[in-house]
Each structure stands twice: as structure tokens, then as C-alpha cells.
């Protein structure tokens, strides 16, 4: 699963996801892409599940680009522990995704295969998405 090799700080604030994506809202690598329509935290496990669903449907043909990276450490305290006594340990890694962000890109397969692969990937994610196609080719 994806996670940073090293970080400047071990833990981060929760924060909020406001506004729309400034960058990363256009297709850069592939012909087909999966665009987020809602703000949400996407975990490394969800990214990996979506990637596996796509590559399995594409039968390892074509190419997949993952345009998001889980760089946000999410902490949790153990079960049945009283409040206080500091912040919990890092439980998993996540990525803040804003509306308009391209999360995955595909190239090298036919349009029906690409659309179905992206649909299967979208089912693994907790947000509404849209399949986008590069128009300038």
C-alpha cells in the first residue's frame, strides 16, 4: 500500500476539505480518467482496491496512473481508552481529495474496457465520481 517513506512530522491536524481542486483537474497521462465530484478522505486501502479492480478488468493490458497519494497520517486511540493522555498513534494513511480532482488515468485499452474498469474502481471509493475522456486527440 502507498505511504510516505518519511515525513517532517509524525502526526497532523484533521483539517477540513474546502473548495475545489486547483490543480490535477485535467488528464495529463491517459485517455480516460476518473474525476472526483465530492470532497472526501480517500484511504490507501481504497486506492489499492480501486487499482486492483481496474488492472484485473483490463487483464494487465494498457497502463494505469494513480494521480493521488496518501500523505495524511490518520490517528486513532485504542479501544476502551479514556480521553486525554495525548494523541493516538498513526492508524492509516489517507489523501484529501477535492471535487474536480483526477484520481486515476487509463490508456492503452478500448473505450468500453476503460469505462468498465473505471466504473469498477469507482465502486471501491466512498465518493461520487465521473469518467472523463480526453477530447483533443
Curated annotation (Swiss-Prot):
One of its GO terms (biological process) is translation. It comes from the Bacteria. One of its GO terms (cellular component) is cytosolic large ribosomal subunit. It holds the Pfam family Ribosomal_L16. Transmembrane segments: none annotated. Binds 23S rRNA and is also seen to make contacts with the A and possibly P site tRNAs. Part of the 50S ribosomal subunit. Belongs to the universal ribosomal protein uL16 family. This is Large ribosomal subunit protein uL16.
Amino acid at each position: 500500500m502507498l505511504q510516505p517513506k518519511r515525513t517532517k512530522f509524525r502526526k497532523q491536524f484533521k483539517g477540513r476539505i474546502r473548495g475545489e481542486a486547483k490543480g490535477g483537474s485535467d488528464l495529463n497521462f491517459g485517455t480516460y480518467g476518473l474525476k472526483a465530484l465530492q470532497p472526501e478522505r480517500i484511504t490507501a486501502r481504497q486506492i489499492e482496491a480501486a487499482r486492483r479492480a481496474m488492472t484485473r478488468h483490463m487483464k494487465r493490458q494498457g497502463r494505469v496512473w494513480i494521480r493521488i497519494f496518501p500523505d495524511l497520517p490518520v490517528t486513532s486511540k485504542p479501544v476502551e481508552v479514556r480521553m486525554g493522555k495525548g494523541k493516538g498513534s498513526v492508524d492509516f494513511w489517507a489523501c484529501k481529495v477535492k471535487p474536480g480532482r483526477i484520481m486515476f488515468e487509463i490508456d492503452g485499452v478500448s473505450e468500453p474496457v476503460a469505462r468498465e474498469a473505471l466504473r469498477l474502481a469507482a465502486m471501491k471509493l466512498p465518493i461520487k465520481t465521473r469518467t472523463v475522456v480526453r477530447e483533443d486527440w
